[in-house]
Amino acid sequence: MIITSLLDTDLYKFTMMQVVLHQFPGAQVEYRFKCRNPGVELAPFVSEIRDEIRALCSLQFQDAELAYLRSLRFIKSDFVDFLGLFRLNEKYIRVSALPSGEIDITITGPWLHTILFEIPVLAIVNEVYFRNTQKVPDFPEGRRRLEAKIGQLQQPGLDSLKIADYGTRRRFSRAWHEEVLRVLCVRLGSDDRRGAPGQFAGTSNVLYAMKLGVTPLGTMAHEYLQACQSLGPRLRDSQVFGFEMWAKEYRGDLGIALSDVYGMSAFLRDFDLYFCKLFDGARHDSGDPFAWGERLLQHYRDNRVDPLTKTLIFSDALTVPRIIELYQRFNGRCQLAFGIGTNLTNDLGYEPLQIVIKMTRCNGQPVAKLSDAPGKNMCNDEKYLAYLRQVFEIPSPQ
């Protein structure tokens, strides 16, 4: 059994799920799976994937897990009570093999009851694929690569550089993920122990944050702002609506805004003085990170907000050398945080799977992301994409 705990997922799933429970309990959604690697055949593993999903749907939260969630300052007690009754329902997810050798995974149902599928299902697909294609994994090579990353991070002048693990969805396996995290805790220290802060800031994975005593990290994902296209009053105001509903729920806590659902220009138009002050910072997830950072810092200055009080989080396909470059550019000008995913939890020398599960519909209408990287778009409704570009004044990709 690959997933043995419903906490084995990213924190932002719970922070978004709490907003769904309190603000949008009736929303109906659809998610679709996509593998971006050409020529990768997942169809032979469909029955294994189905078996693992069936096992996932048998899980419930344990008392110790609920107590841990209750201990997080931003999680409210009625939400924990709800989770005490919660389990994933197999009727909302369909996995099928396609003639091309690819697979189709569709998740359809109430947002509140389907939001927790994405991360464990992606972790299942990854682990099933790699345990079938790499019967004897090269863990010594994985350890050597991890050691090299730690060595790079421990170079002189990088003492205040902190990294976080964002790699649950694309990890090589659960066991490897845990080994990586344990090594990082020992070698890079952690914020919660020994008084002196280390270079390992924490993990997005709630189970391992609990097990290892590190900080769980995360706020919102694209699906939240995408759903607001359907749930908000007017499409043009949907990003503002999303941020305002987030603020209504969290009253200034969990204040990292995701900036690339409509690209940076539309984000900055919507991210006015009020949001500049209310939110702690923003997260970069597509496009040129250096240009993004410079634009955001200038935007803060234009709004008479001191950038040194704000946090820039970078999380787009990061590697350690890229993190060091970004750190050297922005250190001392703002607060910084870096989340590494695939490159941390699936770097054993094999090509990682570029797999995603994205929300494609909410309350019967299409929803989409028009990110700063056109290849990341998932919506196949060209009319809706064109309408979205028009509304947010985004030029068509050439």
UniProtKB/Swiss-Prot annotation:
Modified residues (Phosphohistidine): H222
The entry's keywords: Ligase, Phosphoprotein, Pyridine nucleotide biosynthesis
GO biological process, one term: NAD biosynthetic process via the salvage pathway
The EC number(s) this enzyme carries: 6.3.4.21
Coiled-coil segments on the chain, per record: none
Post-translational modifications reported in the UniProt record: Transiently phosphorylated on a His residue during the reaction cycle. Phosphorylation strongly increases the affinity for substrates and increases the rate of nicotinate D-ribonucleotide production. Dephosphorylation regenerates the low-affinity form of the enzyme, leading to product release.
InterPro entries per the UniProt record, alphabetical: N/Namide_PRibTrfase, NAPRTase_N, Nic_PRibTrfase, Nic_PRibTrfase-Fam, Nicotinate_pribotase-like_C
GO molecular function: nicotinate phosphoribosyltransferase activity
Homology family: Belongs to the NAPRTase family.
Protein purpose: Catalyzes the synthesis of beta-nicotinate D-ribonucleotide from nicotinate and 5-phospho-D-ribose 1-phosphate at the expense of ATP.
Record-linked PANTHER family: NICOTINATE PHOSPHORIBOSYLTRANSFERASE
Descriptive protein name: Nicotinate phosphoribosyltransferase
Organism of derivation: Acidovorax ebreus (strain TPSY) (Diaphorobacter sp. (strain TPSY))
Source organism phylogeny: Bacteria, Pseudomonadati, Pseudomonadota, Betaproteobacteria, Burkholderiales
